[in-house]
Design a protein with these regions (language model features):
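Non-heme di-metal
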Residues: 1-122
């Protein structure tokens, strides 16, 4: 999950530089939230006594169309959402997972909104 959050954070922050206005602000905020999720997951990993996780850096984004990159992000968001929801009953970290699931759900909605507002050639 950490690697997927890192990939999403990198994608959103990169895409925020490729668009303007409201769309850029939305992507910037989503990128920051994904960075927060990544830090929380690393913190849990550390508290569980597993040390610091070794996470490979995300692949650099290609210059693919924005719509295609957002579709990839949507898939990762859905996978993370399922993982967080399944862990939301954890007695120790359940509330954290529930909050992250709520944010992932909102990211899915925002991605769909962004996809719906893109010009046909993007």
């Amino acid at each position: 999950m950490i690697a997927e959050e890192w990939a999403d954070a990198a994608a959103y922050l990169t895409l925020a530089r490729r668009v303007q206005g409201r769309e850029s602000a939305i992507l910037q905020k989503m990128g920051q939230q994904e960075q927060s999720h990544m830090a929380c997951l690393k913190g849990m990993y550390t508290l569980l006594g597993a040390g610091r996780p070794e996470i490979p850096a995300p692949q650099p984004l290609d210059r693919a169309p924005i719509g295609l990159l957002l579709r990839r992000c949507y898939g990762r968001e859905m996978r993370c959402l399922a993982q967080y929801e399944s862990r939301s009953s954890d007695p120790e970290y359940g509330q954290v997972f529930a909050r992250m699931a709520q944010q992932e759900r909102e990211h899915c909605r925002q991605i769909l909104e962004l996809l719906g507002s893109l010009p046909a050639d993007k």
